[in-house]
Amino acid sequence: MKNIKKIIALVIAALMLAALASCNGTGTGTDNTTSPATGTADNTSKTYKVGICNYVDDASLNQIVANIKSQLEKIGTEKNVKFDIEYDNCNADKNVLSQIITNFVAEKVDLMVGVATPVATAMQAATAENKIPVVFSAVSDPMSVELVSSLEKPGANITGTSDFLNTDAIFDIMFAQNPDIKTVGLLYDVGQDSSATPIASAKAYLDKKGVAYKEYTGTTVDEVRLAAQSAVLDKVDAVFTPTDNTIMKSELSIYETFAQAKIPHYTGADSFALNGAFMGYGVDYANLGVETANMVADILINGKNPGDVPVMTFDNGTATVNTDICKELGLDYDAVAKTFAPFCTKVQPIQTAEEFEN
């Protein structure tokens, strides 16, 4: 009987020890689980999914995209976060654009970036209900296309960066270079919202100055090429194009037509000059991309409401002059730069190429 009692006592003691070990094990496990979880949150970066859509493959817009990506990568390293970027280009096709945005919504991106006005307006419409934040880039006149309520307080779920063009400044430069201009060709795509305001401003400027103008339009590269040839046949003295993506895409196909006819092409972006226009006047598109990325980070990392983030505009006083075209026009770059200087914050040279160097 005593042996049985001893056995029972030993069994009970063993069970009590097991219970104590179990309790202690649970407590230790909880501590270890919490600590690594906190450590994981601290040491492993949060990932934000960003959908970027470019409107068309041209030097200015490509430069914006490249700088958005590189700046987000830089911010990610500094802030210990990751940006999972989904990038696509609709190549000016509305159906493709719609599908790209639909895919972004289906993939549950945290934010969309629309490069150029048509992409931004399409994203605005697609996010009216789901309220996915949208940051636009290179939208010349966000007020006129009703992207924002005001530049200071955009409202809704959208904000961005604008490449607003000072059209009068371009014409001041044009007439400083050649006061004897009698007729100016206005080359643009009537379907580009970004061209509407600067073309209207150009007409008002020329009407006030008493200078004639003729309009030449095209929606494809072939149509733009024919329009350029028509301007040459009409013997215009100079040609103006705003920040028009259709003409930008066509510039490499038309610049020789103008240069051989000794007609200077004045445009609204440095990428035109890169692709063979005489002069491009406007914003620094590399910086535009950087600031667009900074906005994206401010919204995603800092929790800013897009509707409360003011639209960013820029000093657009940089004139980029193509030195190759200067020679073909019989002009001296140094003399041209001196003439342009009073109307610009900076005059810089460039040579004809397809893309900007990284």
Predicted regions and their residues:
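Hydrophobic alpha-helical segments within soluble ligand-binding/sensing domains
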Residues: 42-43, 141-183, 283-304
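C-terminal motif of bacterial Sec signal peptides marking the signal peptidase cleavage site
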Residues: 18-22
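Beta-alpha junction/loop-to-helix N-cap segments that form part of ligand/metal-binding clefts
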Residues: 86-149, 244-259, 263-268
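Hinge/cleft segment of the Venus flytrap/periplasmic-binding protein
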Residues: 298-358
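Extracytoplasmic "Venus flytrap"
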Residues: 44-70, 75, 86-95, 191-195, ...
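An alpha-beta-alpha
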Residues: 50, 68, 159-209, 305, ...
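Bacterial signal peptide processing site
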Residues: 24-26
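Pocket-lining segment of extracytoplasmic ligand-binding domains
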Residues: 193-265, 269
